[in-house]
Amino acid sequence: MTTVAASTRPQRAEGRGHLAAKLFDGRTRIRELYQEGAAKIRLPDTFDASMEAVIINTAGGLTGGDRMDWSVDAGAGTRIDVTTQACEKIYKASAGTAEVTTSIEVGAQARVDWLPQETILFDRAALSRRLDVDLDEDSEFLAVEAVLLGRKAMGETVETGLFRDRWRIRRSGRLIHAEELRLSDGVAALAARQAVLGGQVAFATLLYAGPLSEAYLGKVRPLVEGSMGGASAWDGKLVVRLAAADGFSLRKILIPVISALRNGAPVPKVWNL
């Protein structure tokens, strides 16, 4: 008698969420909403013409082999703020790489603020992330991505792992900004280099693309002065890069910068929970 061992594939978290908005009676309204698997989208009430979307991974985190896909389509004249319910945790991967893709289209005279809370990488995590944005000629876009290499208060460190982050931002089909970040293998040793993070374990990149880039630069530079970071504006875009010793120290700089790039508006309320 021959015994055949059952082969089981570990359960993986997968999800897809899509939100499209249109302008109706001067307010941003839902045009399409689709949710599948572990991806959920919630739309809290707002008291102005904008829409706030909170995206949720009901799996509670990601590990090797998981996949999440998000897409946002902001119609002409709309205003959408997109954030996450909590920090996204990327756990140790036994096999494979977690993948997250985000696609955003911003129509004429529309604005999208992409404001997810921090991504927390644990030791031996593996994450590949991609952000693709298509802008109309006169639309605005703000993106914030913050990453923590473990939680310092919990004594966590990230010695090895994989983190790939790819951004492609286009306006009227023309590439205006690209990011290509890769941390792999000896992550701690790489982060310790002065030309990389200088030993800091919390870092963030902010990008604003729109007509106010030069005006925003004058507001942002005083906020980052004295920190490990800087801000520059050119060709209709503004880029801010920050690094700090831990997540709390990063937020103390990051939140005022985000507010400045939102004409004084605060970060979404879920950031404060």
UniProtKB/Swiss-Prot annotation:
It is found in: Cytoplasm. Its main location: cytoplasm. Keywords: Chaperone, Cytoplasm, Nickel insertion. Coiled coil: none annotated. Pfam families: UreD. UreD, UreF and UreG form a complex that acts as a GTP-hydrolysis-dependent molecular chaperone, activating the urease apoprotein by helping to assemble the nickel containing metallocenter of UreC. The UreE protein probably delivers the nickel. HAMAP family: UreD (MF_01384). Belongs to the UreD family. This is Urease accessory protein UreD.
